[in-house]
Amino acid sequence: MPSISINIILAFAAALLGMLMFRSHMMSSLLCLEGMMLSMFILSTLIISNTQLTMSFMMPIMLLVFSACEAAIGLALLVMVSNTYGLDYIQNLNLLKC
């Protein structure tokens, strides 16, 4: 396995670990989620370019589109929660409080 693939897998693992450790604030969770999506995009692009699979060249672009949609929805939710409660704690998103 090339060293760049190992580095990208380690970046994904670090973002996943950050997602598990810093889950109290919504902004840090969104940043870790974006890091995970970026490392998945780079790894899938490298794998597809190394294997010369012509049928799956669209997969990284579709992953990037879904990542952009996820980021837009996450930022809209962050703005809504911070305007409503004044904080970006994830505990504010509990639906059982209603």
UniProtKB/Swiss-Prot annotation:
Family matches, as InterPro entries: NADH_UbQ_OxRdtase_chain4L/K (IPR001133), NUOK/Mnh_C1-like (IPR039428)
UniProt key word Magnesium: no
Record key words, sorted: Electron transport, Membrane, Mitochondrion, Mitochondrion inner membrane, NAD, Respiratory chain, Translocase, Transmembrane, Transmembrane helix, Transport, Ubiquinone
One Gene Ontology molecular-function label: NADH dehydrogenase (ubiquinone) activity
E.C. number: 7.1.1.2
Topology with respect to the bilayer: Multi-pass membrane protein
Subcellular location: Mitochondrion inner membrane
Signal peptide annotation: none
GO cellular component, one term: respiratory chain complex I
Sequence intervals crossing the membrane: 2-22, 28-48, 61-81
Protein's UniProt keywords contain Protease: no
GO BP, sorted A to Z: ATP synthesis coupled electron transport
Catalysed reaction equations from the record: a ubiquinone + NADH + 5 H(+)(in) = a ubiquinol + NAD(+) + 4 H(+)(out)
Subunit organization: Core subunit of respiratory chain NADH dehydrogenase (Complex I) which is composed of 45 different subunits.
Family designation: Belongs to the complex I subunit 4L family.
Protein name: NADH-ubiquinone oxidoreductase chain 4L
Organism of origin: Allocebus trichotis
Biological classification of the source: Eukaryota, Metazoa, Chordata, Craniata, Vertebrata
